[in-house]
């Protein structure tokens, strides 16, 4: 099947401004599968260079482009005739216009390329790097920036989530200027039947410049074949956000709302800070919050604890219907992004406020009860210690997933579809699957020759059958 002419005219390249992830720098190439035996080579190449430009220098920046100051050449620092040139400063021939949010450092030895994310962007957004990802811990460890490498290990693309970039640009009074070059090349045995006059075309559409050409192939391709190339040069702007809630601390106009009364009356999250009432939530909220890295669930009593998508949880209680109740002003003090998580599970008040929560917050009399979830870890440890003290070896094997299993072993699992089954699986993994059968066999004796080695439950049952009478006689 022949490749369409439109493919080489590159009118399908999406503007960066509409994308969820904005490339800050890209140097990528790809060899594509041939759609037919006639096509012997099909490749693409993309280069994108960007700079954060101060708003007052927007006009000067527009004079620069792919062949004039904004491409994917490596950055350099050093002393020029006019003074010191900093690698992170984006400038024309006369003055600084902004900053390079990514600095490309070239290392001669080994022909290495290292891409550095601008430290001001990292600090301003509160990012934490793990490998090739940058996360924002205070926002539920949201992934903000990601770096991609090619098969050769060289950096190929670094991109940032649009809303975070726009927040930063708004705070700094900047706009992102982008210059790119896109190329699509085909080598084919037959000459493409395109409608281009004189085997080529040129077009300028807005800020885009398109070119196409069909000519005889040259080395290293067979000279009796045809070489087709389509190219696009583009400059474009990614505008700043209207507000900056993260960096500048602007108020979020799109705040969540919460049901306050049985009649369905609601209040905005921003209006809850001084509210003297309680909000009610479906218990499925817990699973949503704990999906976030850093999310936590701690217990203060049988029906109260702290819960949140970050380590700074809010005081909650469980009422007689199993609903989660929280003092409204505690929700009002959460960040907007976390309020949205809570709002999705907000329900009409029903069943009254948790008695233990009311006693703790309004009467300063915290309950002396204990949540079974809070005793699970210590119960397992005590059992393991008792077995070790008696028989000289651990009953339960250590496993790196124990901490996460304990976090998920809670009553709210049962509120989810198939949640009770999942809860039973978590408890099984915590105890049954960690039992060291060999440690038990060392106490009760190995199976007879020819008998199958018992599983965890069978071994535990045999241990109980042998040791229980001894324990009773010792009482």
Predicted regions and their residues:
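Charged, amphipathic alpha-helical stretches
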Residues: 1-108, 112-114, 123
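Weak global preference for isoleucine
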Residues: 3, 22, 27, 48, ...
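Extended, non-transmembrane interaction/recognition domains
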Residues: 114-415
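Intrinsically disordered, low-complexity regions
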Residues: 4-13, 18-24, 29, 36-42, ...
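Amphipathic, oligomerization/interface secondary-structure segments
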Residues: 385-475
């Amino acid at each position: 099947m022949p490749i369409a002419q439109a493919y080489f005219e590159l009118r399908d390249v999406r503007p960066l401004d509409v994308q969820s992830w904005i490339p800050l720098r890209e140097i990528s190439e790809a060899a594509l599968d041939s759609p037919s035996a006639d096509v012997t080579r099909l490749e693409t190449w993309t280069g994108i260079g960007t700079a954060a430009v101060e708003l007052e220098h927007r006009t000067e920046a527009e004079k620069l482009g792919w062949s004039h100051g904004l491409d994917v050449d490596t950055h350099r620092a050093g002393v020029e005739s006019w003074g010191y040139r900093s690698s992170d400063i984006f400038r024309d021939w006369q003055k600084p216009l902004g900053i390079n949010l990514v600095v490309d450092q070239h290392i001669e030895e080994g022909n290495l390329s290292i891409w550095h994310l601008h430290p001001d962007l990292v600090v301003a957004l509160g990012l934490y790097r793990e490998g090739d990802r940058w996360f924002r811990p205070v926002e539920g460890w949201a992934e903000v920036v990601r770096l991609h490498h090619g098969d050769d290990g060289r950096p190929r693309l670094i991109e940032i989530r649009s809303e975070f970039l726009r927040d930063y640009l708004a705070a700094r009074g900047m706009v992102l200027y982008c210059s790119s070059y896109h190329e699509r090349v085909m080598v084919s045995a037959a000459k493409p039947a395109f409608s281009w006059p004189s085997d080529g075309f040129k077009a300028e559409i807005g800020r885009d410049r398109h070119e196409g050409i069909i000519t005889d192939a040259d080395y290293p391709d067979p000279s009796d074949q045809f070489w087709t190339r389509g190219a696009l040069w583009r400059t474009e702007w990614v505008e700043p956000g209207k507000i900056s809630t993260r960096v500048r601390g602007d108020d979020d106009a799109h705040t969540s709302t919460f049901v306050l009364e049985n009649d369905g009356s609601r209040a905005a999250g921003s209006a809850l800070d001084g509210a003297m009432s309680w909000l009610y939530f479906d218990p499925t909220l817990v699973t949503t919050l704990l999906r976030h890295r850093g999310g936590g669930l701690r217990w203060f009593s049988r029906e109260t604890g702290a819960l949140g998508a970050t380590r700074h949880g809010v005081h909650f209680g469980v009422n007689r219907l199993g609903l989660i109740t929280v003092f409204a002003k505690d929700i009002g003090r959460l960040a907007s992004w976390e309020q949205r998580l809570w709002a999705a599970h907000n329900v009409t008040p029903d069943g009254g406020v948790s008695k233990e929560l009311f006693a703790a917050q309004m009467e300063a009399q915290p309950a002396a009860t204990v949540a079974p979830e809070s005793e699970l870890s210590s119960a397992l440890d005590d059992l393991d210690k008792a077995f070790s003290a008696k028989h000289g070896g651990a009953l339960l094997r250590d496993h790196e997933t124990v901490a996460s299993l304990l976090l998920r072993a809670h009553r709210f699992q049962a509120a989810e579809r198939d949640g009770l089954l999942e809860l039973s699986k978590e408890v099984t993994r915590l105890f049954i699957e960690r039992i060291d059968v060999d440690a038990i066999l060392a106490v009760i004796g190995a199976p007879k020759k020819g008998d199958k080695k018992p599983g965890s439950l069978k071994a535990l049952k045999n241990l109980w059958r042998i040791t229980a009478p001894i324990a009773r006689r010792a009482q």
